[in-house]
Structure formats: C-alpha cells, structure tokens
Amino acid sequence: MSAKLLNSNLWEADPELFDIIVKEKDRQRAGLEMIASENFTSVPVLQCLSSCLHNKYSEGMPNQRYYGGNEYIDEIEILAQNRSLEAYRLKSEEWGVNVQPYSGSPANFAVYTGIVEPHGRIMGLDLPDGGHLTHGFFTATKKISATSIFFESMPYKVDPKSGLIDYDKLAETAKLFKPRLIIAGMSCYSRCLDYKRFREIADANGAYLMADMAHVSGLVAAGVIPSPFEYCDIVTTTTHKTLRGPRAGVIFFRKGVRSVKANGQKVMYDLESKINQAVFPGLQGGPHNHAIAAIATAMKQATTTEFVEYQKQVIKNAQRLCEGLISRGYSIATGGTDVHLALVDLRGVGLRGAPAERVLELCSVACNKNTVPGDISALNPSGIRLGTPALTTRGLKEADIDKVVDFIDRALKIGLEIIKVSGLKLVDFNKAIEENAEFKKKIENLKEEVENYSKSFPLPGFDKY
C-alpha cells in the first residue's frame, strides 16, 4: 500500500476539497457569525477531534465493552463523565451521566426511548413558540419530528402578546393530557426558564421533568443563569453551542431516592440502565471516541475563571444587542433577553424572516429566519434569531456590538428598499437584487465594511483551515 495515500496532507491529497474548506474558513473569518446555536471551538477540542481516537471501536460502557483494546478509551470516557459532573457541580452519588450520544437530537430521543413507552405522552414547547423539533413538533397535516411519530406529543405555548411561556395554561393542559415526560427546553426563547414551576407541574401529574439545556449549557456551567439540576430528573445538552465544545450530546440522569411514600418506603430512581441501554444498543452503535475526548477537554475549560467571564460577556453582548435594536425601532420578543440570543420581530417594520436573513447573509452577517409569537406558519416566519456566543468568542464587547447593530440596521434598511420593488417573496427578492445594479452596489459596499471589521478580530482554531 502506498504510504503517500495514507500520509499526505489534505491540501496535497485532495486540493479540490481543501480549497472549499479554506473558502469556508475565510467566510468564518470575514463574516459576523450570529447564528445562536453556533460557536468557534478551541484548538484542544479540534486536536481531540482529529486524533487517533477516531480509529477505535468501543461499543458498550467503560469496563463493559464488546471489543478488546479499550483500556485507554475507558480512561478517556470515565474522565469525560467525571468532568461533566464537575462542570455542573454534581455529586456522583446523586447524578449519572452518559457522554456517548452523537449529538443533542439523539440524546433527547434516547431519553424518550428509555423512559416513555411507545405512544407514551410528551409535552414540549411548541416549535413556532421557541421549542425544538425533537420536543414533538407536528402540524395539522403532518407529524414532522420522529418524536411526534413514535410518541404522542402535546405542545405548550407562549402568550402571543408577551412572548413568555404561559405556565398556567401549561399546568391546565398537563392536567388533561397527563404526560409521562415534560420537557423544559428551547431553541429560541430568550428568558430563563422557571424550573421550579415546571417541577410543580410535573409532580402534580406524576411526570418526569427533563431539561434540554442545549442552548444555555455554557451559561449554566458558568453559574450566570439558574441551573435546571435542582429541579429536574434528567438534563440533556449538546456540547457545541455556548459550551463551546465538539458536536456531541450528553445526558445527565438522577440516581438514588426519587420520592418517599406515605408509609416511609423509598422509591428509587431507575433511570440509569434505561437511558444507557437506550443509547446503546437501542439507538447507536460504537461511540465517537474522538468526540468524547473533546467533551472531556471542553468540560475542563468550563470550570475556568476565563470561561465564566466569557459567559458573562455573552449575556452582556446579547442585552446590548437588544437595547441597540430596540433604540432603532425594532421589536424584540419578550422585550429583551436573559441569555445568549434575541428574537427580532420584523412585522412592525414591514419585513419578513426569509428576505431579512438573505440580505444579511449577502452583507456577511449570518443569522437565521425564525418564527415569532403569533406566527401562523413556520414556513413563512416573521422574525430572525440573533446570537452572541460566536462573536463573544472572537473578543467582541459592548462597544463592538453597537457597531454590529449598525451593520444589521443598515442591511435591513436595504432589504426594505428591495421589498418595495420585489414584494416579500424570497424568489422575487433575489431576482430584484440580481437585476438592480444599485441594490447590488449598496450590498457590496456594506459587505466590504462588515468584512474589514470582522477580520480585525481573531478567529480560534487552525490557521489554514
């Protein structure tokens, strides 16, 4: 076998692919990354992901493998488990953890598989109101998420005027629906969740309470927002958003006494084996050991003072972003933010999510279109979601966010000019840009400003790619 095939660098072995990767690196460096679920991970995490650990199969749990040669893989996974507990200040006699899920969606589905019977009942925040697909989303005509296909799901919602979760209505619906599991989690909700109230509702209906803290797990680790662990039976998370680790998932589960009966008999948690067996062999095969190592080093970073200061700055930047946009006439769902993201309602200025996302993208500001409270269709959303984790990782602070607000405002104003010609349909919007030299020029000029500004901030990772 040719040693060259095995030992060449990517840029030598596959320059076509490498050139595309370099273009993506340049895009990340030159643009303002404001997708709330994205971040720039550290060099140690990237080194784990590209290490020899990629080569090893290790089905099963540490010291209970179906393959030989896992002595050091076991050490790494146990280290990742211990550090995950330490990052959230958890006692091993009270909490267990599984670090094998490939990402957040598999982690959530493993919980459902383990503790909810087929066609059992689940409640989660509705997707148009800020929930996640895996929390059971369906429409009047179609079950969209596998959660809604294999389980019976019932959404709870926000108040359409305030944008805040209607806990009273949630309690009322839960009393009628009697879910096996209630999910306290979100993908686009800018306020801290009331885990105590969730716990009360779950207890009133004999339900398990699961927090999906994928978006805010870094903030929780840093102690800058309330923790779900005091009140929840299960906590799931991704590790690549505010936690700034690899693309992976983690499941925390309670151990020990769950409750005490009137006669004094203790009722014990039985989550550990159910969840572990749901992950493997229920849903997955061999775990991704390179990702588990990356979880271990990311969790170590999460216990540092530097990480805590970073998370504080993420929130400061998000709040400054809201203040700046409000001062320029934009509406923010819930009136502001407690976390890392802002949901901008564009109905008041005559825009929609899709054209807003597109014009910002053309100006090198990356975000995503998003439903806002009161939207009827998830296919035609009225807002955009903006996040500060990635910008904060690059070193932006409040004064820099003021500049970012200016860029966003100017891009959206260009979008409004285009809409006057094209209307709100995205295909017509794009066509108007292509056919109008003045629109093109305005976009190109703003893009150049944005990219020159963005390039002045460092980008973590490898220099070349």
Swiss-Prot record:
Pathway: One-carbon metabolism; tetrahydrofolate interconversion. It catalyses: (6R)-5,10-methylene-5,6,7,8-tetrahydrofolate + glycine + H2O = (6S)-5,6,7,8-tetrahydrofolate + L-serine. Its cofactor is pyridoxal 5'-phosphate. Changing H132A: The kcat/Km for tetrahydrofolate is 7.4-fold lower than that of the wild-type. Pfam families: SHMT (PF00464). GO terms for molecular function: glycine hydroxymethyltransferase activity; methyltransferase activity; pyridoxal phosphate binding. Disulfide bonds: none annotated. InterPro entries: PyrdxlP-dep_Trfase, PyrdxlP-dep_Trfase_major, PyrdxlP-dep_Trfase_small, Ser_HO-MeTrfase, Ser_HO-MeTrfase-like, Ser_HO-MeTrfase_PLP_BS, SHMT-like_dom. Optimum temperature is 30 degrees Celsius. SUPFAM superfamilies: PLP-dependent transferases. GO terms for cellular component: mitochondrion; nucleus. Keywords: Methyltransferase, One-carbon metabolism, Pyridoxal phosphate, Transferase. Highest expression in the ovary and testis. 6- to 7-fold lower expression in hemocyte, silk gland, midgut and fat body. Optimum pH is 3.0. Stable under acidic conditions. Retains over 70% of its original activity at pH range of 3-6. The modification N6-(pyridoxal phosphate)lysine is found at K241. Its EC number is 2.1.2.1. GO terms for biological process: glycine biosynthetic process from serine; L-serine catabolic process; methylation; protein homotetramerization; tetrahydrofolate interconversion. Interconversion of serine and glycine. Belongs to the SHMT family. Homotetramer. NCBIfam families: PRK00011.1. This is Serine hydroxymethyltransferase. It comes from Bombyx mori. The lineage of its organism: Eukaryota, Metazoa, Ecdysozoa, Arthropoda, Hexapoda. The gene is 692975.
